[in-house]
Amino acid sequence: MSVIDLPEFFYKAILLLIESGVILGSLGVVLFTNIVYSAFLLGWVPVCISFLYILLNADFVAAVQILIYVGTINVLIVFAVMLINKPQYFRFLKYWTVGDGTALALCTSPFLSIIAAILSTPWSKISLIVLSNKIVEEPLTDNVQRIGFHSLTDSPLPFELLSIILLVAPVGAITMARREEAVEAEESEALKTKDDFPF
């Protein structure tokens, strides 16, 4: 039984939870001053959006949503952790400026317009597009279709290993760069000590 076959009450409850997760995650991204917390919440938003695709019986789109966006945000988290040297102090709200108020005003109007459009749209009259089995049984003539099909069916392990290698490579490069900076800092401190005590 698919999610769409659930009773309408459960469907609305699940949809409300997903929308709440998207809104709260988006607010956390812009309100948290710690970049690591913001990056984690930025990864939570595409996950909630993928749940919306699952409600629409678009499983493949939901999986691609998680693989692409959440994977990219994980790389962002790694870069944030490795490149930020100064200590991060937790503070939920920062001091508001004129630019913050202007940005809030510019973002609120389209946000309210989208909410009005969502509420005024007759969603119950929109028919769901269900893919038939004929599309799956058709021969794969496109190279992209062949690569995607064999990568996710015949050889998923090399596909995942490739993604891990692409993640490990920048992490290793950043680690080596930071290690060289630490060695240079220790050498400069040693030279200062020799200058202070020439005897």
UniProtKB/Swiss-Prot annotation:
Entry EC number(s): 7.1.1.-
Lineage: superkingdom: Eukaryota
Catalytic activity: a plastoquinone + NADH + (n+1) H(+)(in) = a plastoquinol + NAD(+) + n H(+)(out); a plastoquinone + NADPH + (n+1) H(+)(in) = a plastoquinol + NADP(+) + n H(+)(out)
Record bears the keyword Plastid: yes
Broad enzyme group: translocase
Bilayer-crossing regions: 13-33, 35-55, 64-84, 96-118, 157-177
Disulfide bonds: none
Cited InterPro entries: NAD(P)H-Q_Oxidoreduct_6 (IPR050290), NADH_UbQ/plastoQ_OxRdtase_su6 (IPR001457), Nuo/plastoQ_OxRdtase_6_NuoJ (IPR042106)
Name of one Pfam family that matches: Oxidored_q3
Subcellular location(s) of the protein: Plastid, Chloroplast thylakoid membrane
Example of a GO cellular component annotation carried by this entry: chloroplast thylakoid membrane
Membrane topology category: Multi-pass membrane protein
Family: Belongs to the complex I subunit 6 family.
Subunit: NDH is composed of at least 16 different subunits, 5 of which are encoded in the nucleus.
Name of the protein in question: NAD(P)H-quinone oxidoreductase subunit 6, chloroplastic
Species assigned in the record: Huperzia lucidula
